[in-house]
């Protein structure tokens, strides 16, 4: 398995093993019952499969805050059966207060940090001709070399045209016992 994280605004934060990230998004999909289809699409499609557009940054923040609140009422035991045996044994998510919000606090915090960096860099560097800066959206990405360097080269149009699993998940292989 390999590690993945969030990248945005020139900041990369490695968060977890790919199977844990996959479980994070599956739990969001399964337990975000109070979200509208449009709100769920911001996280369940834009963040999971594509990237967070600048115009969606604030709405994505609000949706994630709602999900985090919802996760604060759900036990970490909801992860049972969602992680391969190896990840259950070595699971860093088990050292929490017992809620999904605590288990995935690193995920929520990393997304927020990358959103903040993307917005700060855009404000600071845009309009300065010597930089020719463009918004660097938040994406889920492989965080180990050389995967990170390869994934970093994927164009936004490739993300926009993506059909099927996200790029960060396409390299997952099943382990044989």
Describe each PLM feature range.
Residues 1-177:
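Acidic (Asp/Glu-rich) sequence patches and key acidic residues
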